[in-house]
Amino acid sequence: MEALLIVILVATGVAVGLGQGLLGVGGAFIMVPVMVAVFEHMGWDRDPAVKIAFGTSLLVILPAAVATTAAHHRRGAIWWKAALVMGAAGAAGSLLGSTLTTRVIGGEIMKIVFGVVGLLASIRLVTARPKESPEPSPETPLLWAGVGFLVGLFSGLLGAGGGIVAVPLMVSVLRFRMHQAVATSAAVMVFTTGAGALGYFIHGQGVSGLPEGSFGYFYPVAWLCLAPTSIALTQVGTWALPRVSAGALRIAFALVMVAVGLHMIGLY
């Protein structure tokens, strides 16, 4: 891989880490388009480039989700009973999603779908403010499982953690308090990203024509460029959160997501 491409991926890891630490969202919606562009510049075909970007993205998000979950657990903020139910269902959904993307739908279509979802997510990032229910969260295991499965399906299909859909669903449908939803969502993402990454790895075994250096739908060089910087900068972003304007950051991050979404769709 060219030195410039490595620098681009490392810089992307910095941006992803800051975005996750400051806003709690956005990792995959920055990582995946950059990886696809880098892989295509390296001469890869679009279909494996998209699938490998999805699989690698999930494995970048996984350690960050583990670290975030540990921090929330130390504060006693996670509702573990709900997290385990949603996580188990989410793992099943993520495995199904990774199977659909790698075996049924294909990378060309999923690149466009990813772009559309990125545009919708950018709108939600700026405008949505889920309202908390004044009543305590009820224990509804079947509903937990349903929401977890949907979050996992989203995660596996698009190589994303799923937090951008999990938190509003937990608040509006499951009636979680916001802080409880954010913390529990991190725990659920450990299951969804782990299962999804495993699915992309397994479904990539024995596939002919994959680029040299990839293991299934996973590219270790990209992971090494993205994961350490994103994890480290997540802590910096968390530290900087009280010191910056969250509103301005949301708008700036949303504009970046719009730009990469339009690029993934193919409008420029």
Can you say where each PLM-predicted feature lies in the sequence?
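Generic hydrophobic alpha-helical scaffold/packing signal
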Residues: 182-185, 191, 195, 229, ...
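Hydrophobic alpha-helical transmembrane segments that constitute the membrane-spanning cores
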Residues: 27, 194-199
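Juxtamembrane transmembrane-helix boundary motif
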Residues: 1-22, 30-51, 67-154, 172-173, ...
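Transmembrane helix boundary and interhelical junction motifs in multipass membrane proteins
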Residues: 24-34, 159-169
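Small-residue-rich alpha-helical segments with characteristic i,i+4
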Residues: 169-191
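A structural-propensity feature for long, helix-poor, extended segments
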Residues: 62-64, 197, 216
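Residue-level signal for the membrane-embedded core of alpha-helical transmembrane segments
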Residues: 26-30, 57, 61, 117, ...
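Transmembrane helix-bundle signature of multi-pass membrane transporters/permeases
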Residues: 54-61, 87, 91, 185-193, ...
